[in-house]
Amino acid sequence: MQERSDFPIAIIGAGFAGIGAAIQLKKAGIQSFTIFERSSEIGGTWRDNTYPGAACDVPSHVYSLSFEQNPNWSRRYATSSEIQEYLLGVVDKHELRERMRLDTEIVEARFDEESGSWFLTTNEGEAFTGRVVIAGVGGLVDPSYPNIAGLDQFEGEMMHTARWDHDVDLTNKRVAVIGTGASAVQVVPSIAPIVAMLSVFQRTPAWVVGKFDALYPNWLRRFLARVPFFLRASRFVKYWTSELRGPIVFFNSRILSRIGVALSIWNLRRQVKDPELRQRLTPDFQFGCKRVLVSDDYWASFERENVDLVIDSIEGIESKGIRTKDGSLHEADAIVLATGFKLGLATAPFPIIGRQGRTLDEAWAGGAVAYKGMTVAGFPNWFIMMGPNTGPGHTSVLVYTEAQISHALQAIKTLMAENLKYMDIRQDVQDQYNASIQKRMKHMVWGGCKSWYLNEDGSNHSLYPGFAAEYVLRTRKLRSEDYETAAF
């Protein structure tokens, strides 16, 4: 495709989505893009989450870009630092740094119908123009801090898992961990061997299945590097293994749920011998309606003499520790907040003003919706990566991300080839699509309990109700007739 200097493209965010989009644009011969990243380095999730034990919970060969496969993963489930190293290498290989604006936060985006352009404003007051915006800002970015009385009264060290302070030495310290979600199941077994005492405060137990992590031997990595076919085959097998397990996680089926429960109970029994402790660690909600966690050693940590599971509700935090509602004070030298992230899909990441001055927050007042999770009526030429109802509950998020990048690239090529000002998804098409998504939600397991998946009204605007392969097929071909267009 002939390069168009008059067709600037803005990519917001330098995580997997932004980097992947930039690579595919370059491969298509489109060089007129700029990547805006609010932090001083690329990486997104894997730049920020560096707590002990941080790792992906899907196999490494699937948790990587299909067009940048890596034969050198050291283990089945890559660590945070290894994933970040992979991303840094990909950025350097494709010479993307020259097109990046690091330490540059977009604070407002405003669409101009006359020019068919988005006007972006940075935190420094600079102005940029983009004919197309690819928004890869991520849905789980900013840490969520618990609403607990006295949070600022604690005299010891306190840190969120997503903002880990590596200057704090937890060796032989009394440590409290609040939360038992995805980060807790990784950090707890990682710090348990070094601390004097570890108190884990559990509000709700989680279903945890075996991870079966393992190191890859050097000979295997050399073999995969020399014979790329087997690297692709390994990815293929791991992907379809995750897909075929998907129904256990997301379909509202009593039989499938029992299979999931059996797998989790087996994992619990092999790690914990104390029946009373097993009872306290066993959830009472349907398998899959909250995020299913993976770990080989989280539950085993509670068998250690220096690890205590606290199930009493927290009353508040005091200068010396955590007070529970039974009156007990659990003294601590450090508190780790494993309390997850603010759900970025609930609101726009910054003011986004579309056609006729309507903001994205106004469009999403009744819940975040988008056509195929990517485009929102009234916000032309704006493509969301991992938008509403595109989260996976069973496989790699990158399968969805790559499908979205491909879809956005088709739209960009159409805009350029047909000399269009903009493409704006029709409201009726968007409404019809999202009605079908919510109808399918009735057959999914996620409505069976309260979780961050659900809005206050109980609707689910986070996850995709089906297989990743199906989503890829639904997004493979751009339907121009679904869009309102305007020519110059």
Report each predicted region and the residues it spans.
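Rossmann-like dinucleotide-binding core of oxidoreductases
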Residues: 3-6, 10-11, 16, 20-41, ...
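Beta1-alpha1 glycine-rich phosphate/pyrophosphate-binding loop at the start
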Residues: 4-100, 202-203, 270-276
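Short beta-strand to alpha-helix junction loop
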Residues: 70-89, 252-259, 285-297
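Feature captures the FAD/FMN-dependent oxidoreductase FAD-binding
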Residues: 75-140
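Helical element adjacent to the flavin cofactor pocket in flavoenzyme catalytic cores
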Residues: 82-100, 291-315
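A conserved short coil-to-beta-strand element within the FAD-binding core of flavoproteins
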Residues: 102-116, 308-323
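Glycine/threonine-rich phosphate-binding loop and adjacent beta-strand/alpha-helix elements that clamp
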Residues: 334, 338-415
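C-terminal active-site-capping segments
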Residues: 399-402, 406-488
